Amino acid sequence: FLEKNTQDINTFFQNQDYFEIYKKYFSKAQIRRKNNTMGKELGSFYTKLLNSFDPNRFTALDNPIKNYFGFKSEGFFISYCIINKGYQQFIETNKNLFISMRSIFLQIDKQDKLKICSVPELKILDLIFWYEANLAVEKAKRNIHVR
């Protein structure tokens, strides 16, 4: 299904009509498994695709971060839209914080092996929350095993 519509999807991307692309091609994509065709929501796949096309505007989102922000029972794409918008607003209102963070990274990484100046702010936030979310998952696992 997606392969047949590649040109149409590319046109939507060029027009930056990202919600329309999701609604038309990824919210109920027809997936063939063996001899059956079934509808499947591909929100997670689509958000990874957006991130690949433009990592400066679209964050990568995985389930631990989605759950960390309290969206465990929400649809992936809607959660993504809210979290991505929140990241963008945080970045806009905290430019000086990112300048300070980059400065600290450069003091630690004097040879600039991390290339921190070229890492998008969205990626920095994603790394921070990925760490926090996975730490919370590990803590929850330990609490389950302790009881």
List where the protein language model places each region.
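Helix-hairpin-helix/helix-loop-helix acidic hairpins
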Residues: 1-41
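Generic preference for well-ordered secondary structure
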Residues: 5-9, 45, 49, 74, ...
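Long, low-complexity, intrinsically disordered segments enriched in glycines and aromatic residues
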Residues: 18-19, 23-26, 57-58, 76, ...
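Catalytic DNA-binding helix-loop module of base-excision-repair DNA glycosylases/AP lyases
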Residues: 26, 33-70
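C-terminal accessory module of base-excision DNA glycosylases/AP lyases that mediates lesion recognition
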Residues: 63-147
